[in-house]
Amino acid sequence: MTTARSYSGFELVRTFVAGKLLWAVLVALLVSTPVLAQDRPVHWRHAGAMPPGAIGRQRLMRGGPLSGFCQPVEIRAPGGARIAPAAGSGFLEGRPERLLVGLAIGPVYRFRVTEIPGQPGLELFPTVEVVDRLHPPPGERLRFPIPIELTREELLSAAEGRFITRVIYLEDPTLAIPLNEQDEQRWVEARPGEDPLVVADHLGRPMAILRMGGRVPDGDESALAFLYGAPPVQIYDRPQNRSMMKKPAVR
């Protein structure tokens, strides 16, 4: 899977492409699921200007086995940090370092990240919008979640007022570079002014969008508005002895 990320601040506008690849797993998934090839191309026009939720709704309008599907997503944070999903008018208790959840395609989900290493008291509130689904073998959904990594660099950049957009995509095996993957994420920089969603679409199939920075709870804003209505989240225990997918990413 891949992610696309962009930074923007008062004096900084940058777009990156970041990636992590599980070559054998991605090829197996694509070969065993012909529908994936039929989904291309997408052509995301003016995607960067769309408000949160619009891209997921647009994807649902294209049809396919998406509506009502609960897609596993694993959010990963630096060691010691805690991640909590929104629920009701607040947040559930945070889980350390990794949170495995099931999200519907289309809604926007707000999360809270706390206890960031070296940043006592800092809280950040990223959102995740799932725009497509994976097609793993039957009974293997939880072994192959969409991975969303929150790096310390990104968290600190968001805390400084920069806005980060990352698009996680399923890499096209015909474009993949067969490298031995390390635990750290591999990043490819896109040109300034490029839309990370469009870049991700050229390299594979966009799966989810992470947005972070620039939003904290406002006293004049209702809790439900800030939480985008707090759509229900399915929380999973992580499977034992799981082989995680490595996926390329655009940031």
Regions found by a protein language model. Name each.
Residues 33-37:
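Sec/Tat signal peptide C-region and signal peptidase I cleavage site
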